[in-house]
Amino acid sequence: MKSRNGPLRVGIGGPVGSGKTALTEKLCKAMRDDYSVAVVTNDIYTTEDAEALVRMQALPSDRIVGVETGGCPHTAIREDATINLQAIAGLNERFPDLDVVFIESGGDNLAATFSPDLADITIYVISVCQGEEIPRKGGPGITRSDLLVINKKDLAPHVGADLEVMDRDATRMRASRPFVFSDMKRGDGINSIVSFLREQGGL
């Protein structure tokens, strides 16, 4: 499956608590039987997300690399992606048949974006718990990501979020770009996301 250009690199961004690690876990488990998969996680001062993915048994531990970005996590995925590119290069050496690498950013704000040198496809994750107004607030993650994931839809009634309003706002803000509602705790929506990656990533 591996292309001449190396593995498909999928950037997963979004605010703290939106469900990035849960999405990464579910994607690994959904795709690992068909593809050679690895993960690079970004945390400011720890490798907590990488350790969590190992505990969740998303992949064998040698396929998960945690990098400590220090300071602002968006710098490591945008202005200077060297630390992430080095981690991917190391995984490529270890697994020459690598098909897909998921790059999970540290929790950041709505302005965070991935450098095109780092990610071929970008997924941006938000949570209904952050408020139904999040899609209309815009920002590059909302408007320009290849796929917007609106997670924790099951909690909408408990936090006063109207999914119809979020659907309407996401449609308006993203024009023709796709988005999906999900409940990563139960894996609801994961099949649509995997199908998107297969189609858009040429897997």
UniProtKB/Swiss-Prot annotation:
GO terms for biological process: urea catabolic process. It is found in: Cytoplasm. It holds the Pfam family cobW. One of its GO terms (cellular component) is cytoplasm. Gene3D superfamilies: P-loop containing nucleotide triphosphate hydrolases. Its main location: cytoplasm. InterPro entries: CobW/HypB/UreG_nucleotide-bd (IPR003495), P-loop_NTPase (IPR027417), UreG (IPR004400). The keyword Transmembrane does not apply. GTP binds at residues 14-21. Keywords: Chaperone, Cytoplasm, GTP-binding, Nickel insertion, Nucleotide-binding. Belongs to the SIMIBI class G3E GTPase family. UreG subfamily. Homodimer. UreD, UreF and UreG form a complex that acts as a GTP-hydrolysis-dependent molecular chaperone, activating the urease apoprotein by helping to assemble the nickel containing metallocenter of UreC. The UreE protein probably delivers the nickel. PANTHER family: UREASE ACCESSORY PROTEIN G (PTHR31715:SF0). HAMAP family: UreG. Facilitates the functional incorporation of the urease nickel metallocenter. This process requires GTP hydrolysis, probably effectuated by UreG. This is Urease accessory protein UreG. It comes from Rhizobium etli (strain CIAT 652). The gene is ureG.
